[in-house]
Structures are given as C-alpha cells and as structure tokens.
Amino acid sequence: MSESVLNMFAQQYIDMILCKSRYDVGDIQWFTEGPFWRRTSMKFSREYRILPDYEIGDLKHGLTLENIVDRSETLLRELKDYEETSPLCEKQRIEYLICHMRSLWFRSKMLLGEKSSFDQMTSALYNLVAPVYDYSLFQQIKTELDENLPGQGNVLNRIEQFREGITIPADKLLNVLRDVTEAFHRHAIQNMHLTGNSMPRIRVRALPDPNMVFLSILFAYDYDHIQYERNFNLKYNWTVDKVMEYTGHEMEPGHLTYYEKRTQCFIDTGWPEMAEVSLYSPSSAFTEGSARYASDLC
C-alpha cells in the first residue's frame, strides 16, 4: 500500500513537471514515458535543437504555473506528513520526492517573477549551496599562472595562444570525434557494466548558429539500448579540450550513460519519478557532477 501512495505522489510530480515545460523551454532533459519507445515519424530536423527529443503532446497541457505552485505546495506538506510515520526503507525515496517537489515549486515561483538570493536559489533547485571561498586564493593562482605560463601578454592571452595550437581543423573533426567517442565507449563498457549497445552515431554538419555546439536526435530506447545521433557543428571552434568535454561528458560515460542507467531503474522499480530529469532539479546537479567525475576517471 505504501508504495502505491508514493507512486501517486511521484506521478503528480511528473504531471506537473511536464506541464511546466510549456513555460520553461529546455527544462526536460530526459523523459521515458514507458519501458521502450521508437520514433515512428520523420518529422525531425537536423538544423534546430528541440528538447525533448520527441513530442510529449497533451502531457504538457492542463495546468497553469499558479496551479503548479499551489498543488506542489500542498503535496510538499502531505509528503512531509507521510514521512513522519513511514518505514525506514522508504526514507530515501521520500527525501528524493520532497527535494524534487520543492525544486518544482520554487522554479515555478521564479517563472512567475519571484526573486531570491543566489544561495536560496541553488539550495531550493539543486539542494546545494556553494562553499564560501577566500577570493584572494584565486588571485594567488592567477599570479602563479602569470609567472609560469609560456608566451606573451596576460594570462588570458597566453591561454588563447595555447588553445590555438590545439585547434582541430574542420577536415579532421569527424575522425577525431569518432575516435574519441569510441575510446570513451570502450572505457565505459569495461568499467561501468554496460552492454555496449548505446554508442551514439556521430556526424558533423554546419549548424545555423556558430555558438551551437551540437544537435542531438533520439531515435529509440529500451532497457539497455539508446539509439541516438549527435550532429557536431562544423562552425564551432573545436579544440582538444572541447572534444573531450562534448564526447565523454555529454555522451558516454557521462550523460548518455546516466540516462541509460536511469531508464533501467525506471523499468526495474516502476517508480514514476525515475522517468524524467528536469534541468532545474537535484537530479540535474547529479547528472552534471557524475558526468564530470566519470569522464575524468577515463
């Protein structure tokens, strides 16, 4: 009975998140409506990045932001009341739902114009607060770089000079991206218990905006397979560090691996909250941190 109660809370959370996406473009980073999905239409574009990768249709209609604020606030109170008498085995899941319901509530209020401090925002959205630093430390680091970096000019100029030397020519880009993607893919298989079925298809093309790094298209997913294409922008200034960032961090063993594992968790548990990753949520913070850590380990 208790699991069905939590599933009810979780499904209401998902319903509200999807409705909020009407007012919060780009918020839905990943969504698995069921245990598998396959694109059945050729109505997609390799020219424009549209998130999510497939149309959620009527699921994003039915609630205003004011509705979402009121309902999420009520559900937060009910979740906290339920937590007081819940068994120990449910505590972690309840904490997850409370944190994510709070981020939904807070983000909806932001969209309605409510202001807050930076620390209040990160605490409510991501369950994180930036540590306090003595900023003189950064000046000390800058001074050490200034003394030791080769080249002429200030630190930023010398960094740019160095980056020019690791810029990848456009005619070499596809081979470099494929080789690096394959290397990260092998490391992920060896160290993260993956089937190896989700290596993305890599393409390069001139996208409309030179600041647009890539365009992603999802074609299908199931329990242990994500069929995925990534189009990298030939107009972007590609350097070695950017290739590492946008392959390992963004794909395997980073975000793509996380989405595969999360989809498996959704199917294994049947918990509705595992079906979705919102940009403005603690799950998003974990997505970014785990991708950084995993790609650095490779």
Can you name each region flagged by the protein language model?
Residues 1-298:
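N-terminal maturation segment of proteins
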